[in-house]
Amino acid sequence: MRRYPQPRQTNPNRNMASSTEFRDHVLSLLLPMGPVRARGMFGGFGIFMDDVMFALIAGDTLFLKIDSGNKDDFRNAGSRPFTYEGKKRPVEMSYYSAPEGTMEDAAKLLPWAESALAAAKRAKKN
């Protein structure tokens, strides 16, 4: 099985198209959650379940939705925010990288993905 790079402290999503191979790898890890699908957007992919976007792929990095209910968990796991260059300054989105060591094992990734889906559903209600 191919080993994918873990998120780095630099921002690898800047000016980097996402690979369909990595997208397929992510979808296979998330398959136990149910009907998860990917939609191309801005050179990467949005990851959806029941029309709720709970993750995104930028470059070859998976970012998961965060809110006040799970942000500290992601920070404590060493995850970093998804950022992009805005017109005047970098903009931080409410998505954090999947914690190190989760991208090769669905059992390790799924609790984080389920937390992200719950955060996305809470955000959609508001």
Functional labels for PLM-detected ranges:
Residues 1-126:
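Charge-dense, helix-prone N-terminal extensions
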